[in-house]
């Protein structure tokens, strides 16, 4: 039973470890931005810091870029409004949590959150190849280009937080361009793109004009996008988590039934061992009786002392009749024991033989007292 408890504890520990890791860690809060982490210059954004451990006091700090004086050692309750944003607000942020009873002790830092500020450069242009309207299953490529020497282009779709990025490549017409292949078109959507420089990766240009991609032959042409790597990655991650949890549950069930089978087998073996000695004793008694078929009870006869009588003549014999001499035999006391039928028959035969021997001896003694005629 102790092995079963240890196994259950191990399985529960690994499952909880996976769940906590998926949610951000055991003692780390979760930092997010609303409505989006991509904020236009002069706009506002709300940063939310949440925790499963009941933290109510949070501290926000910036890891890179230009420090923001109003955020230095800023203490807040669960959320903080940041803005109007400037290029100085662009960068990576983290938060820590604490309890009011122990404000000196802080939790581990949260997940990193990147705040992007847009509207710092001129906007690029976005186009679709072979066109903004395609058939279902047809390959679509979106091209983002500009005459500004951008180092990187970022593609954004309305309603999606993930922005794929590609380096800008000089083209023949003197522009800097990046092509985003979307694969076979299944659903449409509205797209924009941004440009940035290596020195300031979180400071983007103005967004391009929105481009609506339509897919013919599909009733929900504007409900979702063509096939994107981000959706595939999310599906795979959730699938891996589901498979791992299912395997852990199956292994736990197999281990449980195996331990149950072992316990039942041990109890059955113990019951059999308890019953074996009585049976062995019965068999041994029967064997002891059967293994001694030739046991015979013998009668031990003491040495008989015969009285020698002197033979006298008839004239010298007394007038009174002589006293008969009787011989006695003493048999040693023996404890009675139960005999088998064969033993009883053999003992009766011996006793009959003994009686005949005794009678013969008495006859011989009696004959010795008969007077000899003519002596």
Curated annotation (Swiss-Prot):
The transmembrane residues are 239-259
Q: List the disulfide bonds.
A: 49-95, 144-193
Report the locations given in the UniProt record.
Answer: Cell membrane
Stretch forming the signal peptide: 1-21
Gene Ontology biological process terms in this record: immune response-regulating signaling pathway
Q: Known InterPro entries for this protein?
A: Ig-like_dom_sf, Ig-like_fold, Ig-like_Receptors_ImmuneReg, Ig_sub, Immunoglobulin_dom
Q: Which residues lie on this side of the membrane: Cytoplasmic?
A: 260-375
Annotated SUPFAM superfamilies: Immunoglobulin (SSF48726)
Membrane topology (Extracellular): 22-238
- Glycosylation is annotated at 139, 173, 218
Q: Pinpoint the Ig-like C2-type domain residues.
A: 42-102, 137-200
Q: What does this protein do?
A: Receptor on natural killer (NK) cells for HLA-C alleles. Inhibits the activity of NK cells thus preventing cell lysis.
| UniProt-recorded name of the protein | Killer cell immunoglobulin-like receptor 2DL5A
Organism of origin is Homo sapiens (Human)
């Amino acid at each position: 039973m102790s092995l079963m408890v240890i196994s259950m504890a191990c399985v529960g520990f690994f499952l909880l470890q996976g769940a906590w890791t998926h949610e951000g860690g055991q003692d780390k809060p979760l930092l997010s931005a609303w409505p989006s982490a991509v904020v236009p210059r002069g706009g506002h954004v709300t940063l939310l810091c949440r925790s499963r451990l009941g933290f109510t006091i949070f501290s926000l700090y910036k890891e890179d870029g230009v420090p923001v004086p109003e955020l230095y050692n800023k203490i807040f309750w669960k959320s903080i409004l940041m803005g109007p944003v400037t290029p100085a607000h662009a960068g990576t942020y983290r938060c820590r949590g604490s309890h009011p009873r122990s404000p000196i002790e802080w939790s581990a830092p949260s997940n990193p959150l990147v705040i992007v500020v847009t509207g710092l450069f001129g906007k690029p242009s976005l186009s679709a190849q072979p066109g903004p309207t395609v058939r279902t299953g047809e390959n679509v490529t979106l091209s983002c280009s500009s005459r500004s020497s951008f180092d990187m282009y970022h593609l954004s779709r309305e309603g999606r937080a993930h922005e794929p990025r590609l380096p800008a490549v000089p083209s023949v017409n003197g522009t800097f361009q990046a092509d985003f292949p979307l694969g076979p078109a299944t659903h449409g959507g509205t797209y924009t793109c941004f440009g940035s420089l290596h020195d300031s990766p979180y400071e983007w240009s103005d967004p391009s004009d929105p481009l609506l991609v339509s897919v013919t032959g599909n009733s929900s042409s504007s409900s979702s996008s063509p096939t994107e790597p981000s959706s595939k990655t999310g599906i795979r991650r959730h699938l891996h988590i589901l498979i791992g949890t299912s395997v852990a549950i199956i292994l736990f069930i197999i281990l449980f039934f195996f331990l149950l089978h072992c316990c039942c087998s041990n109890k059955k073996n113990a019951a059999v061992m308890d019953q074996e000695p009585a049976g062995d004793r019965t068999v041994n008694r029967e064997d002891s009786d059967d293994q001694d078929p030739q046991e015979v009870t013998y009668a031990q006869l003491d040495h008989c002392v015969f009285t020698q009588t002197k033979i006298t003549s008839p004239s010298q014999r007394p007038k009174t009749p002589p006293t008969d001499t009787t011989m006695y035999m003493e048999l040693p006391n023996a404890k009675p024991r139960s005999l088998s039928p064969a033993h009883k028959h053999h003992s009766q035969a011996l006793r009959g033989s003994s009686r005949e021997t005794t009678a013969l001896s008495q006859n011989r003694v009696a004959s010795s007292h008969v007077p000899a005629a003519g002596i």
